[in-house]
Structures are given as C-alpha cells and as structure tokens.
Amino acid sequence: MRRLEHTLKGQTLLYYADFENLPYGNKSGDELVKIAEKNLEKFLPFCPKTVVFACNTLSTNTLGKTNPHGVRLVRVLPKVKVGKRGLLLCTEATANSDYVRLLKKENSLLDVLPVKGLAEEIEKWVRCGKKINLEGMLRCADRDYGYVSLGCTHYPIIQAELKKLFPLAEFLSGEEDAFDKIVNSVTTIDTDDHGSEVCFIGKEAKMLKTLYNKGIFENV
C-alpha cells in the first residue's frame, strides 16, 4: 500500500479489511466466491478503475468465478520457480484451490504446506504483540528448500523470522506481480510531486488508519 501511495500520484486508494468474515483460510471455495462478490459490490459506488483482491486465499479460489462488473480485477497469486525445489506456505483454502492443485501438478518439485492459523497469529502479533511460535507451526517442514513462496499476503510481515527457519531459501511473493499490474492498469498518473490519498472504509477504518500511520503495513 505504501509503495502504491507514492507511485500512483494523484490517485485515491480505498482499503477495506473484511474482519467480519475472517478467517478466510478455513472456508470453502463457494463461500469465498460469495464473499468476494459481496465485498466487490462495496467498491462499485466509488466507480473504481481497479479492484485488488489483496489476499491469496480469495484470489486463488475466485479466479474465473467472479463477475467483475466491468471493473479491472487484480489478484495476488502464489509465485513459483520452475525446475527448483520449493515450498509454498499458504492457508488451507489456498492449498485446496483448483489454482494451487494445477500449480502443484505442473511443478513436481513444489511442496505445498497449509499452515493452519498462521494468518490469524500474525493478526494478533500486529494488534497486540503476541509472539508467534513459528518453529512449532512449521516443525514438519524441511529446512533446505531452494525457495519459499509466501502464499498469503500476511506472511511477508514475518519474512525476517521465516528466513531464520529457511536460511538457504530465496523468498518469493506474488505481491510484486500484483503491484506491476495495478500500476499498469492506471492509465493516467499525475506528474505532481504529491502522492496518493489513502482512505480506509468499513467498521475497522479508524483502527486500520492508526496501524497504517504507525508503519505496520510498510512491507505490505
């Protein structure tokens, strides 16, 4: 978000966090499609140029299954490296999605590890500083992967801690590809020096704005 704020000059960026339906990771594909449709409708009155599903779980489970209502949709999807042994860390729902099943079928060197509850633990850490027992949650994973794909937009927040557990791994995230797609989807960018305006909508708007101003989303 911070990079978009500085890159997309003169734009208004709306951020909505769907706390009402969390967690996404334990929901079925059909449930996630309904949630995506409902949340997309919240943005339509603002006539957005682009709507971003900034969640791997939502992105992988709704690909080709949602009505974009004439709006450009950008999704955050897991990234892999062909021909290199890798580990995809993700939610249970992401692991069960058709997208990841196909990804696994096409990449025999890819292991998929759904980490139950990790996204929620990261939320608790962000909100109240509760320590995450990463080593315990990932105790069954090998430590010698060539790369680790962060298949949840929460996971980059703890990348430094993950690096301690996977010291040999390169870390990948689909967020970079999504960022490029967002920037390319905006056809007019002001040349003035002022950045974009970031607005938070929904019941938790005030709390999100506070966290954002504290730099919690600096790497998100």
Which sequence ranges carry the predicted segments?
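Non-catalytic structural scaffold of enzyme domains
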Residues: M1-V220
